[in-house]
UniProtKB/Swiss-Prot annotation:
Originating organism: Thermotoga maritima (strain ATCC 43589 / DSM 3109 / JCM 10099 / NBRC 100826 / MSB8)
Cellular compartment(s): Cytoplasm
Oligomeric form and interacting partners: Monomer.
Keywords: Aminoacyl-tRNA synthetase, ATP-binding, Cytoplasm, Ligase, Nucleotide-binding, Protein biosynthesis
UniProt motif ('HIGH' region) ranges: 122-132
Broad enzyme group: ligase
Domain of life: Bacteria
One term of GO molecular function: ATP binding
Main subcellular location of this protein, as a coarse class: cytoplasm
Catalytic activity: tRNA(Arg) + L-arginine + ATP = L-arginyl-tRNA(Arg) + AMP + diphosphate
Protein's name according to its UniProt entry: Arginine--tRNA ligase
């Protein structure tokens, strides 16, 4: 809200004075003596106009000098313009939050553009790992923020239920089933050894007895495929419910083969002369588009590669009417991006349609030590285990608060701590404190009138808190532009910090001064609205008592 207001005022000045339009930053400066907000617009314009940036800054300041939004405007260094905002402008932020309530922060940036976020997608061959958890929360927060900014968002999970990994899963489950019946069967090379398959096998023994003991054929393979897929997918959906995540669409890879989409896309590529046959296989001419080797689409045995079905899947996304799609992948899949871009180009799909957001890996830490082994799965820590230990709120907040491009160390002890050192506790406690203020006011007989006596707000802590309330929409835009949920958690930490400072330094509920109490309760109420809204976008609760 505040950034938009300043940017609009400055843009009008430079358009009138120079006939120019230029992108520039408006942000909170590093030190309070540099004002409430600062801009680099003069330095940006200097390059275009070939003019001294301080001279440009002076001309901008002169044009804005009489504006009641500012107490004063100063020029610093090579040409930074520092704005000291008026109390009137800051109080207007509180008034706006109180009027708009849960609508505050919403803006129609996307204008209804149809976009898709695909994330959490995994081979349904085992439980979600903590790495999947990080991806799910990144996707959830981005989806929520994009909706808040006026986009028509679909959340989708791609189920890799075709291909050799599903056959290996079936063989692994069959081996576990036979082992429980006393028949020694080896898990195939590259198969799945997690204890979760023993649990499924145990259920099967109870349900069907020894019907498929030491028996393997096409019918048995199909039975074990479907059983493993159904049980694991059901378990994955249980985990999604536990973490508070849901998808609009669960899309089956197998369906692309069954409905003819894969063959349709292969035919399109052949007609565009971008495929060829070699060694009995069908290859895509990736090298015609980028400096990379050609890739196999259809193996010599007639089966499709993952690359082929993935191309078909994204072609179908385009045909479903999405203007842009955002796939969220682990950073180990970065090599798949250029060849997918090449495939989209080969199909004449616009360059900006297919987008990938990469995230780094997660390491768990407990008692200062790295957690290396899971008790259940034998080789990885499951998302379920993490949720059981630290709970939904801490899991979601902690995954959101680290830049996706940064390797994450998830501190289990910190996530469980009921102290102000725990970031999610710190923010939630601010919300609980606000609720307690109103209970306290009622007990002390201080009558609350919403929106009244705001003219009494204006000390340093109140100003900082009001300014931070006015930065909410800017934080949401940064999340969307940078694909960085941590921009929202950073904002909430800053807002909570400014509220705790205000709460600690000032008497908010004072029966001897009801009008000032009312003004400060209004500021607290506005803060609570924004804290609750921000936490909701992350999927975290805003408790009234702690």
């Amino acid at each position: 809200m505040l950034v938009n207001a300043i940017r609009q005022k400055v843009s009008e000045v430079i358009s009138k004075a120079y006939g120019s339009e230029i992108e520039f930053e408006v942000e909170i400066p590093p030190r309070k003596e540099f004002g409430d907000l600062s801009t680099n617009v003069a330095m940006k314009l200097a390059k275009t106009l070939k003019k001294n940036p301080r001279e440009i800054a002076q001309e901008i300041v002169k044009s804005l000098d009489e504006d009641p939004s500012f107490d004063r405007i100063e020029i610093m260094g090579p040409g930074f313009i520092n704005f000291f905002l008026s109390n009137e402008l800051l109080r207007g932020v509180v008034k706006t939050v109180l009027e708009k309530k849960d609508e505050y922060g919403r803006e129609n940036v996307g204008n209804g553009m149809k976009v898709q976020f695909e994330y959490g997608s995994a081979n349904p061959t085992g439980p979600f790992t903590v790495g999947h958890g990080r991806q799910i929360i990144i996707g959830d927060v981005l989806s929520e923020v994009y909706k808040e900014l006026g986009y028509d968002v679909t959340r989708e999970m791609y189920i890799n239920d075709a291909g050799k990994q599903i056959r290996l899963l079936a063989q692994s489950l069959w081996a576990r089933y036979n082992q429980l019946l006393g028949v020694e069967k080896e898990i195939p090379e590259g198969g799945y050894r997690g204890e979760y398959l023993v649990d499924i096998a145990r259920d099967l023994v109870n349900e069907i007895g020894d019907r498929y003991k030491d028996l393997w054929n096409e019918e048995v393979e199909e039975f074990f495929k479907q059983t493993a897929l159904n049980r694991i997918l059901s378990s994955m959906k249980d985990t999604l419910e536990k973490i508070g995540s849901s998808f609009d669409v669960y899309f089956s890879e197998k369906s692309l083969i069954e409905d003819g989409t894969v063959e349709e896309v292969l035919k399109l590529l052949k007609n565009k002369d971008v495929v060829y046959e070699k060694d009995g296989a069908v290859w895509l001419k990736v090298s015609a588009f980028i400096d990379e080797e050609d890739k196999v689409l259809v193996r010599s045995d007639g089966t499709y590669t993952y690359f082929m079905t993935d191309i078909a899947y994204h072609y179908k996304k385009y045909k479903r009417g999405f203007r842009k799609v955002y796939d969220i992948w682990g950073s180990d899949h970065h090599g798949h991006i250029p060849r997918m871009k090449a495939a989209m180009k080969a199909l004449d799909i616009p360059d900006d349609f297919f987008n990938v957001i990469l995230h780094q890996f997660v390491t768990l830490k407990r008692g200062g030590e790295i957690v290396r082994m899971s008790t259940r799965a034998g080789e990885f820590v499951t998302l379920d285990e993490l949720l059981d230990e630290v709970g939904r709120d801490a899991t979601r907040y902690f995954f959101a608060m680290v830049d996706p491009n940064t390797h994450m160390v998830f501190d289990i002890d910190l996530a469980k701590a009921k102290s102000m050192d725990n970031p999610v506790y710190y923010v939630q406690y601010a919300h609980a404190r606000i609720h307690n203020l109103f209970s306290n006011a009622e007990k002390k007989g201080v009558k609350f009138e919403e929106g009244k006596h705001l003219e009494l707000l204006g000390n340093e802590e109140e100003r900082v808190l009001m300014r931070n309330l006015g930065m909410f929409n800017t934080a949401l835009k940064e999340v969307a532009q940078m694909f960085a949920p941590n921009r929202l958690t950073n904002y909430l930490q800053s807002l909570a910090e400014s509220f705790h400072a205000f709460y600690t330094k000032h008497v908010i509920v004072d029966p001897e001064n009801p009008e000032l109490s009312n003004a400060r309760l209004n500021l607290a109420l506005a803060t609570g609205i924004v804290l609750r809204k921000g936490l909701k976008l992350i999927g975290v609760s805003a408790p009234e008592r702690m």
